[in-house]
């Protein structure tokens, strides 16, 4: 039996739809973001150094993205409680390149079933 492999959506293609639990409550993607640009970005794991610095940078730039009518949505296959603990650690304990006490206010999707990651071609079959 051949396994279906999803590829990353290309510019101009319809974004795969999903509902998901996030650190900011449930989202219905992409319907909740109608009329806005969205950057849906993923990271391999919470509490990793590069992912932490990337999240801190995105969070400090969120106002600029909002001014450009662009929303940020993060995704990983970690669970919600891991996400919450990681974001709390970023805010309370991490300092990087002059950034500290950084609060991440954009949603971070819990995807422990890998459903969303697979829809977006982010996982190997």
Label each region the model flagged:
Residues 1-125:
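Chalcogenol-based redox active-site neighborhoods
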